[in-house]
Amino acid sequence: MKKIIVFFSVFFLITAIITGKKCREVIQKIDTISTENTTNILIKEATTEDKKKTGIKQLQKVRIVIMSNNYTSIYHSSLTLKGDNLKVYYGKNFAKQKGCKKVSLDGDSSYFKNSDVVKIYGKTGITIQGHNTENGSPVYMGELYLYREQSGMVVVNQVDMENYIAAVISSEIGEESPLEALKSQAVCARNFIMKSKALEYEKYKANADDSTDFQVYNRIKPGKNSKKAAEEIRRCEELLCVHPVLGTL
């Protein structure tokens, strides 16, 4: 019986080593990446305070405050949003819904009549008209939450982690960097946002804003390389969750 137990233990360990080889290579290469990396963050295992069976809990979505042009303010006096088949949720508990391709809002908009928060969703993304970046107005995936304040509207983008990471990679180091450098940036970005505590945005339950105070986000449209790097690191971290022992090999 003891020999059988030893045999299976060795078998599963070898299997874990083989399947996790590529992931460990990615993490190990971080130590050799040039200090020219624009996000100067220590590379550590991406974990949160809430640890369960695997010891790691993944953030599925992040919430990012979208600042005005030139990062001068978090407040927007007026907004025009565009997208294919936008859905606008408003009223108490978002009870009302309206479909459209374009919506304009300011602090006096009827959408804010019974609530100070409006949620907007676009399946293929949402464009903020006039919100210019290096390559034109960015497209925001996920949902935009608009909070009415005395100084203007605060915009929070709730987005899947991988879409966020891809848009950070393209904005921080560019789409043309080598894939291994993009992967390393993805690890940096994931680690940073999972540990970020933006106390100034606690009211909006936001993890960060899109400026250099945190991580530059969605200023340059992510391409296939940034998306590939974000996805590969996601798969690596999932494997490390399934086989935590790989983190110590």
PLM ranges: what are they?
Residues 2-249:
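Conserved, single-site charged/polar hotspot
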